[in-house]
A protein has these predicted regions:
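Glycine-rich phosphate-binding loop of ATP-dependent small-molecule kinases
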Residues: 1-243, 247-275, 281-395, 403-413
Length: 414
């Protein structure tokens, strides 16, 4: 019997959900996963001969040889949360200028008190021009009734063709370009409040009469897109990466539905967050002081989404990044190959033996997903497994905490 058959389910279908603080690298991880193996290897994998620890060298070599062999590497299809959000808005209000203007007046502002009539009028002119250019695509999006009820194979194929098609790609690109030109932080807040409204009321505009039944509205649409992609791919492997999930109930939605779902949290390890956000603003803002002001506002919003107390008040529609990160299955730090020497010197006592770059960490994760047990866990991972078991068995209702005490060689103290 061919051993490939034993792992065929893992090889043929995988969903990775991404989460992390703003600027931590979720979009970059999604981009890396969507590339071919050659790009993946070139960008962040070190040569095996750069390691001097025989055991680690063997583990690294096994993972590398496995993924580069045959068709073990399959490019992931990226489902961007913001693209799904825009798709939902267009389905609801596409072509309805009065509703779109109302949505922008309510949410496209840097603060609730800001008067944004002038900038909304300017943005609406450009939106109308885009709407005229892509009327047919918008009408196709509006032709879908209730996304949750799309189960017919022909309708799922049509959903896949529209969402992943070139026309919608160009449409969303132009719309976000217009919105970002009007203000990057305004766009962030528009997406923030609109997603909260949809999870609360099922409508981008409504804020009153929240209903917990609407909490999975966006997740249900993503779920339909996943099913559509599986049908279109047929017998070919389907690999999906969701960029990114910021509500822990949506996270649990996918965990409970798919055994092949893995939640991955990213972390900025060397303090490049500000620099990354500033880099996104350079194209539209030349004034450095204005960029700094926007960066601070974006980081403040990120802190709000991370430390939110809304869940304790029974408001489940808000983003709660802290819970998302805590409930993640796998944690990686966003470390480029160029930053490796500084990281090794600062954190690893000049020991270069380890899966350190983001590509190397993904190399290990994907190998283990597709072939569990391909390499054995290291001492830190074994200790963390015990700590996690202690956490799961914690008697504390409010905080599930687990820990293990080791000596310097990570041997567990008795």
């Amino acid at each position: 019997m061919d051993l490939k058959e034993l792992y065929s389910l893992r090889n043929n279908f995988t969903i990775i959900g991404l989460t992390g603080r703003t600027g931590s690298g979720c979009s970059k991880i999604a981009e890396i996963l969507s590339n071919d193996y050659h790009s993946f290897e070139k960008e962040g994998l070190r040569d095996v001969n750069e390691f001097n620890n025989i055991i680690f060298k063997r583990k690294y070599s096994i993972c590398k040889k496995y993924l580069e062999n045959g068709d073990n590497w399959v490019k992931f299809v990226v489902i961007k949360y913001v693209d799904v959000l825009l798709f939902f808005i267009l389905n609801k209000y596409g072509g309805d200028y009065a509703k779109i203007k109302e949505l922008l007046l309510d949410n496209y502002k840097e603060s609730r008190s800001e008067s944004n009539h002038r900038i909304v009028s300017s943005v609406m002119k450009e939106i109308k021009a885009i709407d005229y250019e892509y009327t047919e695509t918008i009408n196709e999006i509006k032709s879908f009734d209730h996304f949750k009820d799309i189960k017919d194979e022909s309708e799922l194929r049509r959903l896949d063709a529209v969402f992943f098609g070139e026309n919608y790609y160009n449409l969303k690109k132009k719309l976000f370009e217009v919105l970002n030109n009007g203000g990057y932080f305004r766009t962030r807040l528009l997406l923030h409040w609109t997603s909260c409204n949809i999870r609360s009321t099922g409508d981008p505009l409504l804020t009153e009469k929240p209903n917990i039944k609407n909490i999975y509205t966006i997740a249900n649409l993503i779920n339909r897109l996943i099913k559509a992609k599986r049908i279109v791919n047929g017998s070919k492997p389907t690999k999906i990466v969701i960029d990114s999930i910021r509500n822990s109930l949506e996270l649990m939605f996918f965990k409970e539905r798919y055994s092949a779902f893995y939640m991955l949290a990213t972390k900025d390890i060397i303090g490049n967050t500000r620099e990354r956000i500033d880099g996104r603003l350079c194209e539209t803002l030349t004034d450095s002081s204005e960029r700094e002001r926007i960066v601070l506002k974006v980081l403040d919003l990120d802190a709000t989404e991370y430390r939110t107390k809304d869940f304790s008040k029974g408001i489940f529609s808000s983003p709660d990044l802290e819970n998302c990160i805590q409930k993640s299955d796998y944690h990686i730090f966003n470390l480029k190959k160029d930053d490796l020497p500084e990281f090794i010197r600062k954190y690893c006592n000049n020991d270069a033996n380890g899966f350190y770059t983001r590509e190397e960490q993904l190399l290990k994760l994907l190998s283990l997903i597709q072939l569990p047990g391909i390499i054995t866990p290291n001492s830190i991972e074994r200790a963390m497994q015990i700590a996690n078991t202690a956490k799961l068995n914690s008697g504390c209702v409010s905080r599930k905490v687990g820990a293990v005490i080791t000596e310097k060689y990570v041997n567990i103290c008795q």
